[in-house]
Amino acid sequence: MEQRPRGCAAVAAALLLVLLGARAQGGTRSPRCDCAGDFHKKIGLFCCRGCPAGHYLKAPCTEPCGNSTCLVCPQDTFLAWENHHNSECARCQACDEQASQVALENCSAVADTRCGCKPGWFVECQVSQCVSSSPFYCQPCLDCGALHRHTRLLCSRRDTDCGTCLPGFYEHGDGCVSCPTSTLGSCPERCAAVCGWRQMFWVQVLLAGLVVPLLLGATLTYTYRHCWPHKPLVTADEAGMEALTPPPATHLSPLDSAHTLLAPPDSSEKICTVQLVGNSWTPGYPETQEALCPQVTWSWDQLPSRALGPAAAPTLSPESPAGSPAMMLQPGPQLYDVMDAVPARRWKEFVRTLGLREAEIEAVEVEIGRFRDQQYEMLKRWRQQQPAGLGAVYAALERMGLDGCVEDLRSRLQRGP
């Protein structure tokens, strides 16, 4: 009877130990790994931790939630995101030097090279729908100071926006012209602070220069009439007798003999006989004159050139007229000389400056494949639309700042074919 309670106690103790052990085993949870998380991805049979940015996957993990074998990207390669499957890195891009691109940020293991334009240049997309990855080339920013204008908007993503003219300059046509320094001409309204006061000053000086001589002359005339002794008066009879008295005869030397001023055959002027008296030429007496001549006395150095001989033939200007064939752009070799003198990258800007319509440029690009044939066709169409003078070509190149190309083209045209 005493052994049953002991056996029951032993069984109860065993059951208690089993329950405690099962409870303890249920309280210890096995580690879990969720493949749907951001940092764990399932590679094969296991959920592995991925490689960080700038590393590529060398080998996956060998246990659940284990670390994969990752290596750093080699030089000139990168991976900008966390990697779970990539076994190699992407190659870094190179900036296009032909398009004037520069590296704003060099390539690293976690970022690609960032290409852009250097200071003073702006990005010009080569496609109409421009995005960050679109091809582009760099253009120099417009220098508003060189154009004598204020800078309204600095050059960054687009060209510089220039404003009004700087002080000391005024609008004239499409540009800014320096205010005149001469005080005799007109002074534009915007230049009043520069030349307005000078003009008024010199107007006053000119008025003073006119008034002072008048006052001085009036003073001298008054003094002469009131202070100088008067000449004796001559009666009308005495004056008539003096007028009827012939002058004494004088003997003229051979140099004082009469000479005839000869006019050119095609001249409508009258022939006039004059006499050289002393060192001067005077018109001859009425009986020796073939036509009425004004009473003019000429010294030897003032004698008209046609009296001494035929006039010298006028010298002809060596320059050709503006509309002559020599100043017109001829088809054939001259067109190729223009094509060779203009840089290819600025060709479309050149033909736009000449005045070729944008529709014509686009039509040539669609119809003709080769670039050189496109250049020739654009020049040919421009010649057909308006007078194609070499002066227009030189002026367009100078407006584009290609003075060296102007000299090159002139030398090409002088050498000829």
From Swiss-Prot:
Residues passing through the membrane, by range:
200-220
Carbohydrate attachment residues: 67, 106, 352
Q: How is it modified after translation?
A: (Microbial infection) Glycosylated at Arg-352 by enteropathogenic E.coli protein NleB1.
Question: Which UniProt keyword terms apply here?
Answer: Apoptosis, Cell membrane, Disulfide bond, Glycoprotein, Membrane, Receptor, Repeat, Secreted, Signal, Transmembrane, Transmembrane helix
**Coiled-coil blocks:** none
Q: Domain Death: where?
A: 332-413
Q: In which tissues is it expressed?
A: Abundantly expressed in thymocytes and lymphocytes. Detected in lymphocyte-rich tissues such as thymus, colon, intestine, and spleen. Also found in the prostate.
> Any idea what this protein is called?
Tumor necrosis factor receptor superfamily member 25
- Organism of this sequence: Homo sapiens (Human)
